[in-house]
């Protein structure tokens, strides 16, 4: 179920303050966050935000195409190593 429009997008307060502080600077600073549930807003465009995946911080460069998505969508928490191999070929 989608979030109500009158509530607006969710973004953690500390992350929002860091975004506003770094948007006026010329030097690009990587912002680290644990908030995977925060929505990407237009003020974040052209910033690099490192999102924690449970093990390390994954840098995500924000473009206009990513606005409206959640930060956690671009920081996978699980590694897929493939399905189990079948040993039937080697048994004969």
Swiss-Prot record:
Domain of life assignment? Bacteria
Which GO terms fall under biological process for this protein? ribosomal small subunit assembly; translation
* Coiled-coil regions, chain positions: none
One GO molecular-function entry: structural constituent of ribosome
UniProt entry tagged with the keyword RNA-binding: yes
Supply the Gene3D superfamilies for this chain: 30s Ribosomal Protein S19, Chain A (3.30.860.10)
Q: Tell me yes or no: is Ribonucleoprotein among this UniProt entry's keywords.
A: yes
Keywords in alphabetical order, please.
Ribonucleoprotein, Ribosomal protein, RNA-binding, rRNA-binding
| Gene Ontology cellular-component terms listed | cytoplasm; small ribosomal subunit
Entries under InterPro entries matching the protein: Ribosomal_uS19, Ribosomal_uS19_bac-type, Ribosomal_uS19_CS, Ribosomal_uS19_SF
Entry-linked SUPFAM superfamilies = Ribosomal protein S19 (SSF54570)
User: What Pfam families does the entry give?
Assistant: Ribosomal_S19 (PF00203)
Its biological purpose: Protein S19 forms a complex with S13 that binds strongly to the 16S ribosomal RNA.
> By its UniProt entry, which NCBIfam families does this protein fall under?
rpsS_bact
Q: Which family does it belong to?
A: Belongs to the universal ribosomal protein uS19 family.
The name this protein carries in UniProt is: Small ribosomal subunit protein uS19
Q: Which organism is it from?
A: Borrelia duttonii (strain Ly)
């Amino acid at each position: 179920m989608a979030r109500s429009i009158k509530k607006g997008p969710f973004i953690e307060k500390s992350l929002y303050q860091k975004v506003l502080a770094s948007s006026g600077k010329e030097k690009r600073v990587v912002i680290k966050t644990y908030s995977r549930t925060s929505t990407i807003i237009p003020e974040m465009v052209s910033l690099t935000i490192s999102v924690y995946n449970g093990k390390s911080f994954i840098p995500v460069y924000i473009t206009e195409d990513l606005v409206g998505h959640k930060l956690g969508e671009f920081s996978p928490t699980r590694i897929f190593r493939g399905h189990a191999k079948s040993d039937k070929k080697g048994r004969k």
